[in-house]
Amino acid sequence: MRIGFMLRNLREPGGIQVYTHNLLEELMALESVHEFVMLYPDAQFVGHFGSRPRVREEVVRFPTRLGWDQLAIPWAAHRLDLDLIVNPKLSVPVFAGRPTVFTLHGAEQFAVPEVFPVSDRFYTRIMMPIYCWRAAAVISTTRMGVDEIVRYVGADRRKLHPVHEAAHSRFRLLQRADLAAIRERYRLPERFVLFVGGLNPLKNFSNLLRAYQKIEGQVEHALVAVGFLRWKFAEDVARIEELGLESRVVRTGFVPDEDLPAIYNLADALLLPSLYEGFGIPVLEAMASGCPVITSTTGCTPEVAGDAALLVNPRDVDDIAHAILRVLSDSALRTRLIERGLDRAAEFSWRRAAEESLRVYEMAARRGRRAE
């Protein structure tokens, strides 16, 4: 089978990019007879996967994103004689002429619509039902995601397949001697709690700052924020100054994946009280690195974290503040969260995700052929 992957999102930093890279790396490592065709919107990524056996790279150009998805990809699929088209994010060609599969990374536009621009909400509410209808199969990164897409858009549950993500193997316990260079590179304080993610309203960074301000005089820890700036980030950045926290909040900006494990190892807790996460990969990355986790009762993070994290109401500033104090002051709780977190992270595997995804692709291709 010749499988084409729509890889327009490789340039977009964040969870979907991490998912795409890790999934493709493991898919190509499997002993498989299938050929993988990487479809890029430009030549920027040519050579990224091309040295692998059974991998072909193709540049498919089109001036607009929607046109690339709906016009250029079907044309390329016909020219390349693809058996299946896969998109690691939301979107598939509506008239592809062959089976399609996409991965759903959450239904946040339905769950918390108030934080999204009207244009985003309109696009998702119109197009998601169409994509689900046209796709031969849909992969969701959580079981909750399956339930949500059935509830919000009436998708056919028989098409939906939960496949969990995982932390990359680079996230692990490191020797303290290996951490000094990273501390110096990013000018990290001696004691700190950590936030990881792109700044946008979903991440609830403003409430995290308010919670941190409430306990500022009770802890010696700084707050380190790792990640890039996303939409509506200006409000979060302004909140730091508004709350008088300029000297206690360290913003590193974007950090390469190779440096993140050391930062997790140095942190005394990960704080991820998001309004919604479609998976929440930092939860598993922190756990695998021996970092206690505080995350939300909402979204998909409870499914990912299990009993290995402290869960808080993300809209309750006092609840977040109390949880931070508990983790930093209760050594028995910290030890329990670290031990459970290491065990929990070990339950997830990118190899298993690749194997399960490939089975979905094979099933979708068979289903599509029967429908012809």
Regions found by a protein language model. Name each.
Residues 1-372:
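Carbohydrate transferase catalytic cores enriched for Leloir-type hexosyltransferases
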